[in-house]
């Protein structure tokens, strides 16, 4: 039985989220958005990462926004979000003195360090301008390459506004 739909918004181009959300709801399965390439992209006027039950964003060194490595997980279910917070740091809640810890789950070390977080936070002030430049460059290439014989630009869904993390074309 299918447990989840995992959709990748490749190169910053949003997938057809209306259809995927419909299928997930119809069959009672989870929709997970891989937004690693799509920070700043929108679908039907809404930000990528807001359609799924879960969304994953990458802040790896060459993405729109970087923390050198790392990323962020978002989810709709507050109960699962609390559990995810515990699992990210050895099964322990952050900020609780060790003498008062009640470790009920085995965890991992998936938390971001403070230096990486500061690197990311320092970019938030200008992230919209950076993404806007990627979009302007993508549209420029779309317009120029569309007139070159032998090349085909990526078709963009009417509801999609890509963030053009990388540029793709067909030959």
Regions of interest found by a model, annotated:
Residues 4-8, 13-19, 26, 42, ...:
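PLP-dependent aminotransferase class I/II
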